[in-house]
């Protein structure tokens, strides 16, 4: 008997079940005969270059496995985690970091050992493309001297229209390696005994802060070799009120807080650093309450040239790295405080984004999250977390020189 006749003679419920099975069979047969589209391979997304002004790089020092550090690129204005995370690149052993928007490149001063964490050491300037975060080149340094200290922004700086990369060395004597990133070549080593770090100075030079309270200014020739060296006489007593080396440079003038709550101006616009005015961050009443700076990266600046300082109450001997509970903002032209921002969580480092709506970025040392505040109102907007961070001590913004 034909199939249609059998179906018509079946009870209503059975007839419906049979029709349903036939329909599923027909669909399955059609799906089996159709070819599945192949998943696309080798799909690469690129980032906008130059990066948006409000993006940040967070340095993960990876304290428990330092040869696997990373720089994580984030958009702190976004609410969703999938929109905050833009990418990352690997770094090794607390690598100093620099960014060139002129060359659209990123530089990590890595060091490697031939057998993981032991064996022969090699120091390398690893070069990444900003758009893809892919490694595009490297410059091997001729000796293993790159400093391996807590992350410092002034441990690697670009000068002379981003042609020369300055790398701070300590082994244990201190020096600076000059690397020509345009020619992809090491140039020279300049000794800076008893001094540390590199603050861009003049047209093609740097200054370095010395342990006796003085400073040395160096200028390079067109090839990147030593042209001149001048010592700036001691201008502070490290045994009485030391300077934090983590200053901030605003339009060529550096602002360096002291342990006891002053700030020292240093003008880096000429061939040789010029010591400027020293003024107080605190009132006499606040000084009596032991308000003072504290933390790792304790200063930042916004596009308007305002100075941000991480402050702690009840400070004392040995608390200079403990972080702080407030950020105080200063008009450097007036040398006066204009804003006071209490933090929701204790902070260890700060940064301020370069966008038209600046955000205050604060590292939380307890759980390694990042708090994002409206820099002008002081309102906590969001907390960045669960983005692959282990030990964050430093945030780089898109300001020139970071």
Residue ranges and their predicted role:
Residues 62-65, 112-117, 172-173, 213-215, ...:
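Short glycine/acidic-enriched loop and turn motifs that connect beta-strands
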Residues 76-79, 130-132, 180-184, 220-223, ...:
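Short loop/turn segments that connect beta-strands within beta-propeller blades
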Residues 36-40, 80-89, 134-147, 183-190, ...:
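A short beta-strand motif characteristic of beta-propeller blades
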Residues 291-332, 340-356:
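Loop/turn-rich, solvent-exposed surfaces of beta-rich toroidal or solenoidal domains
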């Amino acid at each position: 008997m034909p199939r249609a006749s059998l179906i018509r003679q079946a009870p209503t419920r059975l007839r419906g079940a049979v029709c349903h099975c036939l329909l599923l069979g027909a669909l399955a047969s059609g799906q089996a005969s159709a070819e599945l589209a192949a998943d696309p391979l080798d799909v690469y997304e690129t980032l906008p270059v130059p990066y948006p002004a409000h993006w940040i790089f967070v340095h993960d020092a990876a304290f428990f496995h330092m040869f696997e550090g990373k720089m994580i690129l984030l958009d702190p204005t976004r609410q969703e985690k999938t929109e905050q995370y833009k990418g990352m690149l690997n770094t090794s052993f607390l690598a100093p970091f620099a960014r060139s928007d002129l060359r659209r490149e990123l530089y990590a001063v890595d060091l490697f050992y031939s057998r993981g964490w032991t064996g022969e050491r090699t120091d390398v300037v690893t070069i990444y493309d900003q758009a893809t975060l892919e490694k595009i080149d490297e410059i091997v340094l001729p000796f293993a001297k790159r400093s391996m200290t807590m992350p410092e922004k002034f441990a690697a700086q670009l000068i002379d229209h981003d042609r020369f990369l300055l790398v701070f060395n300590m082994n244990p004597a201190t020096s600076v390696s000059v690397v020509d990133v345009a020619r992809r070549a090491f140039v020279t080593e300049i000794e800076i005994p008893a001094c540390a770090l590199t603050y861009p100075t003049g047209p093609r030079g740097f200054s370095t802060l010395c342990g006796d309270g003085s400073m040395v200014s160096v200028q390079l020739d067109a090839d990147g070799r030593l042209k001149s060296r001048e010592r700036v006489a001691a201008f502070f007593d490290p045994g009485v009120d030391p300077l934090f080396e983590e200053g901030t440079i605003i339009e060529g003038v550096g602002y360096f807080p002291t342990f006891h709550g002053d700030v020292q101006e240093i003008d880096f616009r000429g061939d040789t650093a010029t010591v400027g005015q020293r003024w107080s961050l605190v009132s006499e009443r606040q000084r009596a309450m032991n308000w003072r700076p504290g933390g790792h990266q304790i200063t930042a600046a916004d596009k308007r040239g305002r100075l941000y300082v991480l402050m702690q109450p009840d400070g004392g001997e040995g608390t200079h790295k403990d972080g702080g509970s407030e950020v105080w903002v200063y008009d450097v032209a007036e040398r006066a405080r204009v804003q006071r921002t209490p933090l929701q969580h204790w902070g260890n480092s700060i940064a301020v984004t370069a966008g038209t709506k600046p955000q205050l970025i604060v590292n939380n040392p307890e759980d390694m999250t990042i708090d994002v505040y409206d820099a002008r109102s002081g309102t906590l907007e969001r907390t960045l977390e669960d983005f692959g961070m282990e030990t964050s001590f430093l945030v780089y913004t898109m300001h020139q020189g970071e």
